[in-house]
Amino acid sequence: MDDTKDEKMSERTFLRQVKKQDGGRQKFDPLKIERCISKSLVDAKVEFTQERVEELTGDVVDILYDMKQKCVSNDSVADAVKKVLREVSMDAYDAYIIVRNRRDRERALRSPIIKTVREIKHADLPSSNILRDNANESGDTPAGMYGKIASETNKMYNLLDNVSKKYAEEHTNGYLHIHDLNMYDLTFNCLFAPVGKKLRTGFDSGTGFQRPAQTIQSAAALTAVILQLQSNQQYGGIACDNFDFELAPFVDRSFRRNLAIQLNAMADYSEDPAFAQYLQQEGDADIEATIKRITKGLAKDGVSMNTPTTSLYFLFPKKCIDKAIAFTDCDTHQAMEALVHNLNSLQSRSGNQVPFSSLNFGLDVSACGRMVSKNLMRAQYEGMGDGLTAIFPILIFKLMKGYSFLETDPNFDLKQQAIRCLARRFYPNFVSVDSTFNKPYVKYLTKTIEIGDPSLFTAKVRGKDELVHVERVEKTEFPIYEYHIAPDDLWEVVDFDGKTINLRKLVENTTVATMGCRTRVIGNVNGPEQTTGRGNFAFHTINLPRLAIESRIAKTSEEDRIKLFFEKLDGMLDDAKESLVERFNLVCMKTYKTFPFTMQEGLYLTSDDKEHELSDDIAEVMKQSTLSIGYIGIAETITLLTGKTYGVDHEVDALAVSIVKHIRDFCDATQKKTHMNWSCFATPAEAVAGRFATIDAKKFGDNKKLADINLQRIFGKGYYTNSHMMDFSLDVSLDDKIKVEAPFHALTNAGHIFYYKLNGDLTKNVEAVGAAIDAMYNGNLGYFTVTMDSDDCIKCGYHGIINNVCPKCGCKDEKYFIRVRRITGYLTGSPRKTIKLSWNDGKVKELGDRHNI
């Protein structure tokens, strides 16, 4: 190329760049174009001179120059070359296409997505964290592999195209974790589903309309369907916040049907003319029609199993009542048994997992509600096939004085049953409605009436046998959307002076509930402060140890380190907030059409307040949800900042609390500014615990400025400790652990959990389990449980602790051992997959260290 032409090209291409396929940029070099043209002509066996090649190169440069851009894409350069070669020789054009396609293929095979797909399809399960990032998803099945490929592909797409560059880099580099990145642009996290509402009205399942439930069996079956359908339109957990209240009306329907059957049977041989109405009538097509007619009449007359049996005996033969109650109890047990089995077998999300379901219960003191609670726990206690522990649903028992905590409370016996069930089957977990940060949200209907009012009905006085007549209340003094009002017999007489009666009735869905993993909603700046029909939209987690590492490297004095740490934390809080808002706005562009069950069937609060078009976006509805900022690694953070051990050196515990309070204060301030529901979250950290630790170990593991601290305590474990939990390997008493961790529960209004591990076979030490639960309740914890090791040998049926050999049959083959363990809030354990085949590396290492959880 002569100097004049080269100078002309340089002038035209001054400061011009080429944007590569991977997004990077490089200086524009005409000589590369010249070499491509020359090679294409050679491959096509076209005769040419150097001058001709330089001329063609100049033509390509002219095309690019005419684009008037300082930076052109790699594809634009290729298109220009193809255009010039096509005019010279189609053979040369084809030769260039072949070379370019080969390079594109080689480049594609080196791409991250192809490497990930190879790992998913070909890696050995124990060596792949991608296949084990969720302990209850099967990454080695066809559906599991398919789901993982789609998941990992959408993660990469979102990082490149949807997440702002700054937040994408913070996620990739381990400052901030964007949870469920695979679903970032598609949907929301979790929901407390209004199951009772859909059981009463029926619903469209997508392939047909499901009729309203008429019995407890059909209600339980449809509950599983509702939870499965909703699970497919979100990515997180699905829960019922008051399962006993929701299902109790259908127990009553079964009772009336069973009573109708008994009355019909008695009418066959009774000479009492009053029983003639229970015989088959001329208008009844068959016996089923007769039973339906009788059942309908009983409902119209207000006959209920919640009515004291002594009163029912005045209306119907005692034998009929007793049998109807007994058969209803049997029906309820079978219904709960079927529900547990269905929720462990109905596959959702492309057949890769069952719904991550949770059922909150324990406060319904009616006969029907108590029957639901009793039989749900009975089904859990009995286990599934071969007596194995059910992984789902996660059962959560609500503790509340006056209802289910004290010995004098009507549901105290259910609390005792819950403790026995926990000792055998890990569940229920417990939630305290009475904790100082939960109790203020509880609401009651109240009414003061005078004796002699004409519109009266009977209400039971708590703890007494006599009945008091009180007025039926239809309205309340606070706004109601869809509050669930307890049955009439659940009115409490607060006081009675002989003339005036003061009453109250619990509005049960204002009592706290939680997802099994710990996520919850509480408070609402955009609607009623209820749980039903609401959920968490999304949460992002801040890597606190990373900020502490950088602060320790930068500053030598403890005071300066802590000051810098909080400055860095402020920056990350802003980024966490903005990244969540960005995510929220993206998903809220989706329409009712995208969510045929959630929105069109009215599961989300306010989604059916008015008529909606399928093209309407979901932004207004999603304002009922919460946005949460989580954190991880308080234990490691305190060590890095002070050199001391959190929970042992108590002088640094206040610093730990101040860090989380700083996050909570930020969330509260953001809520006021944005008028959105913001909350502080104690992150469960299943996959992120190992991910953050691995990234930080690679980056800082050999940093000389960290030589004065025991890095084995930080990086050697292979994971960071969950949220504010104490180091799992510490030998600490229950009381001490409560004192250290309880203050965080008041701060983490997006969710939290407390565990304490008891050793041995807890079925032989139920009293210790009960004492531990009471201590947690009295320690002002919000959500808590006892955890343990639980093993089963499916070869001989032994249950207990199995080390390497079954104590009963001597079996040494691990494939016969079911080792159920609690991974975060939920369980994992299967006869097909050992812990090492289902837990990621970080969680496997954590399991080996566990001493106090």
Predicted stretch roles:
Residues 16, 60-65, 357-358, 636-643, ...:
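Short, hydrophobic beta-strand segments
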Residues 29, 41, 47, 804, ...:
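Conformational switch/transducer regions in large eukaryotic molecular machines and scaffolds
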Residues 45-49, 73, 90-94, 551-555, ...:
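Short, solvent-exposed secondary-structure capping/transition elements
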Residues 627-640, 661, 822:
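Contiguous, well-ordered alpha-helical segments that form the cores/surfaces of helical PPI scaffolds
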Residues 807-853:
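Long insertion/accessory domains within large nucleic-acid-processing enzymes
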